[in-house]
């Protein structure tokens, strides 16, 4: 029997708009849930601990980004390899991609936890922690690090479960942990007054429960059956998965590097301004995480696009690939435009959600929102287009595009502009990098659609 005509999934036949909504909505929910872990902690910490607590979560944020980077490396990489193989009818080979990816997700999480706990204080100082924030950051990060293997497994396996044709299951796994985290945050931080430790413990418990659900559903796949031999690590399998997951992973690693440089710059140039060290770090941390909610919507769309484009490209249905990309980009633009309007017109109301502060605190926050995120309305192009190239088996293009904003444009601007403009230079680096990265993405995808398969 032809494996492509069994009940694997309808990726090659159903209307692409219907498929994108079917896969993107659970992906968006999953990404929102991942962002809300940080947002919920920020909310309760801001209202019960204060500015120093908010600054502490921003100092530890590079480690959270590291977790997402690993999850995307083996999650999107494994899902893309799986769908490309299934599209070609290579079902037996496809199952190895899921098994190997799941093992690598958890194993890398254990390694990251070990490194973090062994070098906790040096890492936090390297990330730019001021002295008056360090104790808060150590308490929070030392506990949250225990949950890294479960966070990475849950986030990465969500892509594998979606690739198996079960996007709603992936959404349920993530949503369950987030709801539990929110309830426990309210109990531990607001009621029991456990501060930073309470927020961290709530986060870890939610992640462990989500990981348990993921393990159950991975062991009961819809289109393939995972056996013990599929869990044995194969160099060739991991190499293929890693090549396809490099683009989204590189983007996260670049984001982590930028976050570290950003924290150090905010600390240094903040000390030379009227704001001091802590206010810029606390404000930038909140705004970064609010922006992550917007980016979660965009990344969710790109992840929902991935199985559709991978399968149809493997099956040589190029018109469906192009149609899916264009519809995803249209959805991304609408979301980006709404985010732009919110960031420009109600920044004070947004920042007030996370607690009160001095007038200097609000002054910096409002300026940072309006300037740094000015080109939000074109920020959808880079993540959607980068993931598109990866999903059709062109990881080099995807990787290059994923690094344009963070490494090619933003990082040099963060170093150069503040030399002439002080802390304002940090703010203006954002829109310049966003505009240039969007232009590169448009040029690359326009060139791709001029090639023979798509004409």
Regions found by a protein language model. Give the residues of each.
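Short runs within selected transmembrane alpha-helices of multi-pass transporters and secretion channels
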Residues: 144-162, 170-178, 199-212, 299-302, ...
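Small-residue-rich hydrophobic transmembrane alpha-helices
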Residues: 54-114, 151-170, 281-341, 345-347, ...
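Transmembrane helical elements of multi-pass membrane transporters/channels
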Residues: 22-41, 143, 177, 206-210, ...
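Helix-terminus/linker motif at the lipid-water interface of multi-pass membrane proteins
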Residues: 36-54, 124-131, 187-194, 256-287, ...
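Short alpha-helical transmembrane segments in multi-pass integral membrane proteins
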Residues: 1-24, 82-149, 191-246, 309-374, ...
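Transmembrane alpha-helix boundary and packing residues in multipass membrane permease domains
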Residues: 27, 31, 43, 80, ...
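Residue-level signal for short hydrophobic patches within transmembrane helices
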Residues: 17-36, 40, 63-70, 146, ...
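Transmembrane alpha-helical segments of integral membrane proteins
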Residues: 409-418
């Amino acid at each position: 029997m032809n494996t492509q005509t069994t009940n694997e999934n309808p990726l090659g036949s159903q209307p692409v708009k219907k498929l994108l909504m079917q896969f993107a909505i659970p992906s968006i929910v999953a990404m929102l849930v991942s962002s809300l872990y940080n947002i919920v902690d920020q909310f309760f910490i801001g209202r019960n601990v204060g500015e120093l607590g908010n600054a502490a979560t921003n100092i530890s944020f590079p480690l959270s980004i590291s977790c997402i980077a690993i999850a995307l490396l083996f999650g999107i990489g494994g899902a893309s390899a799986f769908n490309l193989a299934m599209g070609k009818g290579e079902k037996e080979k496809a199952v190895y991609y899921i098994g190997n990816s799941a093992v690598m997700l958890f194993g890398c999480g254990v390694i990251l936890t070990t490194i973090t706990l062994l070098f906790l204080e040096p890492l936090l100082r390297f990330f730019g922690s001021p002295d008056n924030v360090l104790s808060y950051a150590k308490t929070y990060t030392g506990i949250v690090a225990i949950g890294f293997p479960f966070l990475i497994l849950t986030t990465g396996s969500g892509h594998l479960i979606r690739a198996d044709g079960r996007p709603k299951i992936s959404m349920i796994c993530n949503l369950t942990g987030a709801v539990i985290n929110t309830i426990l945050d309210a109990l531990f931080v607001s009621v029991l007054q456990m501060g930073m430790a309470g927020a961290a413990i709530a986060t870890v418990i939610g992640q462990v429960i989500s990981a348990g659900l993921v393990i159950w559903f991975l062991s009961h796949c819809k289109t393939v059956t995972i056996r013990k031999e599929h869990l044995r690590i194969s160099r060739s399998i991991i190499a293929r998965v890693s090549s396809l997951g490099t683009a989204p992973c590189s983007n996260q690693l670049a984001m982590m590097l930028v976050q570290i440089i950003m924290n150090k710059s905010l600390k240094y140039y903040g000390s030379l301004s009227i704001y001091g060290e802590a206010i810029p770090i606390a404000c930038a941390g909140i705004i970064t995480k609010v922006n992550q909610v917007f980016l979660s919507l965009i990344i969710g769309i790109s992840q929902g696009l991935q199985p559709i484009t991978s399968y149809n490209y493997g099956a040589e249905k190029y018109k469906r690939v192009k149609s899916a990309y264009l519809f995803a980009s249209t959805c991304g633009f609408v979301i980006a435009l709404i985010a732009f309007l919110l960031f420009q017109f109600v920044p004070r109301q947004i920042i007030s959600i996370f607690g009160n502060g001095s007038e200097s605190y609000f002054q910096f926050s409002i300026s940072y929102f309006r300037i740094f995120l000015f080109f939000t309305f074109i920020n959808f192009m880079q993540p959607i287009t980068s993931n598109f190239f990866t999903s059709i088996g062109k990881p080099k293009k995807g990787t290059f595009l994923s690094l344009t904003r963070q490494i090619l444009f933003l990082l040099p601007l963060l170093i150069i502009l503040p030399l002439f403009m002080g802390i304002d230079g940090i703010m203006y680096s954002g829109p310049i990098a966003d505009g240039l990265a969007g232009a590169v993405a448009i040029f690359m995808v326009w060139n791709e659609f001029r090639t023979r398969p798509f004409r």
